Regions:
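Extended, helix-rich architectural segments
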Residues: 1-234, 239-240, 349-352, 445, ...
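C-terminal anchoring/interaction modules
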Residues: 1-46, 116, 124, 130-134, ...
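Helix N-terminus capping/helix-initiation residues
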Residues: 64, 145, 170-173, 274, ...
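A broad, low-specificity signal for short, low-complexity segments enriched in glycine/proline
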Residues: 82-89, 192-194, 247-249, 264-268, ...
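Generic detection of long, well-ordered alpha-helical segments
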Residues: 82-89, 102-106, 272-283, 347, ...
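Short conserved micro-motifs at the rims of enzyme active sites and ligand-binding pockets
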Residues: 135-136, 243, 270-271, 471-473
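Short intrinsically disordered coil segments
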Residues: 140-142, 163-168, 277-278, 472-480
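Catalytic nucleotidyl-transfer cores of nucleotide-processing enzymes
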Residues: 224, 228-321
Length: 521
């Protein structure tokens, strides 16, 4: 039996994963079709002219929950139980915040919410870009499309899988630009991505090549640690292999740089189900009943006339509404009959089904800001909105847990590659040279360790606190300041309002200017 080369071995593993996940890709495509209201495509039509109505209740409900999740965009706060690392923890918080501003994490979060609610699971990738920040380098967290990543279908934890694959098609011109020495060796590999079933985009597959990125994790029984490697191949050619340059692994933490979030977890899998899976049947039935109502309305809109042969009337003559007189023998041979109306309970049932989709998904009237009982107070409406968004809070909790895990990997990458330089830059920007020296010393100590000290931990808070919570929180802080239990400076740190960081910076600059003017005098 011929021994497979490394490239052939990884292609074989990729095909195994790809074929095993064919049903999952079909489910994701179906969920996207349901989300955009295009779910009649797989229903055969008895009559090509029959109506196919769509009332996008499910789409509206999902978008309403996504809008709620906009108030839950996470922010990482680094804390330290040890006083020796307290100053460094504050610096790390600023570094992580800068990373997320650079990679536009708020936009990545919006993409994650779409995948989570529609497809049922979302993926974040954690990596390091050495060219970022003008060559200083920084870690990043970004969204990965669920249709372009493959996990081991055998394992329920992605960290236990044989590999993780990312894949995308690129033109041969792109390949020549990035891999000029290997591009001409690439051949057609017979791999084609699932394309849009509507056929809006019909690319020439012969002008592109599938680029596959493979992450492989191996366990060293002697050291009791894992190593993670990255390989890239396309057109039957191995393009990159980190095992040559980094035999101990790409990243010291030895984990797959991916975090998966499942909305409704599945037993025995790292993936999940979404709102479309839960409410697909209700959406289909409500639209089917709409079709019945519309058919009935179209039939009722046409007057029907029964004419017997003994009536003596001509059918074509009766169709001519411009005539005032029609000649015939027997008027009893002409009978009008109307389409029977549908029962009223059918209309009520349609409304009830749609109301249940909104209510059970959490997109009810209170979460939309509507009230049916005359509530006009802004505070009361905000409180009702917060109470009604349980579904959104549940999804946000899952996303925040995944975000914390991603930030922990992000900190490990900063510690491994550039923490010392980042700390110096942070304090130099503040014109604090002494602080820069202290931070660099603490950073160097941590960088010499094999992993981040357990006393440094990540907590997650939302960037924007909900209106009702912010009002209640700030009122408590004001009372504590008025009673003298805390100082105004502490109160400023505790209160929540937009532009807080800018206000603090202006106050510090003002104090610095006053001290300088006094020293000159």
């Amino acid at each position: 039996m011929k021994k497979l080369t490394d490239t052939e071995k990884y292609y074989s593993l990729f095909r195994e994963f790809y074929e095993a996940c064919a049903g999952e890709r079909a489910r994701i495509d179906k969920c996207e079709s349901m989300f955009r209201g295009d779910h009649w495509y797989d229903v055969p039509a008895d009559d090509p002219k029959e109506p196919r109505p769509v009332t996008p209740v499910l789409h509206s409900s999902i978008e309403n929950i996504r809008a709620d999740l906009e108030d839950y965009i996470p922010e990482a706060i680094i804390t330290a139980d040890s006083a020796a690392y307290s100053e460094l923890a504050g610096t790390l918080t600023g570094i992580i915040r800068e990373n997320h501003l650079n990679c536009s994490y708020d936009e990545e979060f919006r993409k994650l919410t779409h995948d989570l609610l529609v497809s049922g699971w979302a993926v974040q990738e954690i990596g390091y870009d050495p060219a970022a920040l003008n060559g200083m380098g920084s870690a990043f967290i970004r969204h990965v499309d669920v249709g372009s990543v493959l996990f081991d279908p055998v394992e329920s934890d992605i960290q236990d899988g044989r590999a993780v694959f990312k894949f995308a098609r690129h033109t041969r011109e792109w390949m020549r630009e990035h891999y000029p020495e290997l591009a001409d060796s690439m051949k057609d590999d017979g791999l084609f991505m699932d394309t849009d079933e509507k056929g809006y985009l019909t690319p020439r597959m012969d002008k592109s090549v599938m680029l596959i990125e493979c992450w492989e994790r191996e366990y060293d029984s002697k050291t009791g640690k894992h190593r993670v490697h990255m390989l890239k191949f396309a057109g039957g050619v191995m393009l990159e292999d980190s095992r040559k340059d980094y035999p101990d692994g790409v990243y010291a933490h030895g984990k797959y740089p991916f975090v998966v979030t499942a909305l409704f977890p599945r037993r025995g899998s790292s993936l999940g189900y979404g709102f479309v899976d839960m409410f697909e049947t209700s959406q289909r039935y409500s639209d089917k009943l709409d079709q019945i109502v519309m058919k009935n309305a179209m039939l009722a809109s046409h007057n029907k006339l029964l004419v017997t042969g003994a009536s003596g009337f001509d059918e074509e003559d009766l169709k001519d509404w411009s005539k005032e007189v029609h000649r015939g023998d027997n008027l009893n041979g002409v009978t009008w009959f109307a389409t029977a109306p549908l029962p009223q309970y059918l209309i009520s049932y349609i409304e009830q089904m749609r109301a249940e989709i909104k209510e059970e998904s959490g997109a009810n009237q209170w979460s939309r800001g509507n009230t049916a009982y005359g509530v006009t107070s802004g505070t009361a409406i905000a409180a009702l909105q917060e109470r009604s968004s349980k579904r959104a809070r549940m999804a946000a909790k899952s996303l925040h847990t995944a975000f914390r895990m991603a930030v922990e990997q992000e900190m490990e990458l900063e510690r491994e590659f550039a923490l010392g330089l980042r700390c110096i830059k942070t304090y130099i920007d503040r014109s604090d040279e002494e602080g820069a020296r202290r931070a660099e010393a603490a950073a160097r100590e941590i960088m010499n360790k094999e992993e981040m000290p357990i006393s440094i931990r990540v907590t997650v808070k939302v960037q924007k606190t909900a209106g009702f919570s912010a009002i209640s929180h700030n009122d408590t802080v004001f009372r504590l300041v008025e009673s003298g239990m805390i100082t105004p400076e502490v109160g400023l740190e505790l209160i929540v309002f937009d532009g807080k960081e800018q206000a603090k910076a202006l106050m510090k600059n003002s104090e610095f200017g006053i001290r300088n003017s006094e020293s000159i005098r």
